[in-house]
């Protein structure tokens, strides 16, 4: 891996993704990892090795970068419509987690949702990126 800190790697990942405009230019995680770090992915270690890059993609999304993903990999979405499948995927994943919580707590799904509504009302909103 190239000697770098997280901030430098974040800049590299963002720059690489900005070059991948639209779903037709998507980049696979293993390729993004290799280009950002200068390292190769070992097949049996793919998930562990790419964890840092996945966390940086998450950080960029939380900063408001329009990073989508699809069957061909990650890409910078110039068209807001290209973000919809990614947004839907996150939505379904969140609902699946809440269903698991409902089953573990043995309460109705509506009760789990109500608790989160109350929790969110008690917390200040996270500022949205510009």
Predicted regions and their residues:
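A short, conserved structural fragment
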Residues: 61-71
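Short, amphipathic alpha-helical interaction segments positioned at domain boundaries
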Residues: 81-105
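Short, positively charged loop/turn segments that connect secondary-structure elements
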Residues: 37-53
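Short acidic, hydrophobic short linear motifs in intrinsically disordered regions
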Residues: 23-41
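Minor-groove-contacting beta-hairpin "wing" of winged helix-turn-helix DNA-binding domains
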Residues: 70-78
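Short, hydrophobic-biased segments on the C-terminal half of alpha helices
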Residues: 54-58
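Short alpha-helical segments that sit at the start of domains
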Residues: 1-19
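Exposed, interaction-prone assembly regions rather than primary DNA-binding/catalytic cores
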Residues: 100-130
């Amino acid at each position: 891996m190239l000697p770098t800190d997280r901030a430098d790697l974040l800049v590299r990942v963002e720059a690489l993704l900005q070059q991948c405009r639209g779903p037709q230019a998507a980049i696979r995680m293993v390729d993004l990892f290799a280009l950002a770090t200068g390292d190769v992915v070992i097949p049996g270690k793919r998930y562990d090795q790419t964890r840092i890059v996945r966390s940086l993609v998450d950080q960029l999304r939380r900063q408001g970068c329009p990073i989508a993903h699809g069957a061909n990999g990650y890409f910078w979405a110039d068209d807001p419509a290209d973000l919809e499948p990614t947004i839907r995927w996150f939505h379904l994943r969140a609902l699946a987690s809440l269903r698991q919580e409902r089953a573990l707590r043995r309460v109705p799904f509506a009760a789990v949702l109500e608790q989160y509504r109350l929790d969110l009302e008690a917390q200040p909103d996270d500022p949205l990126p510009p």
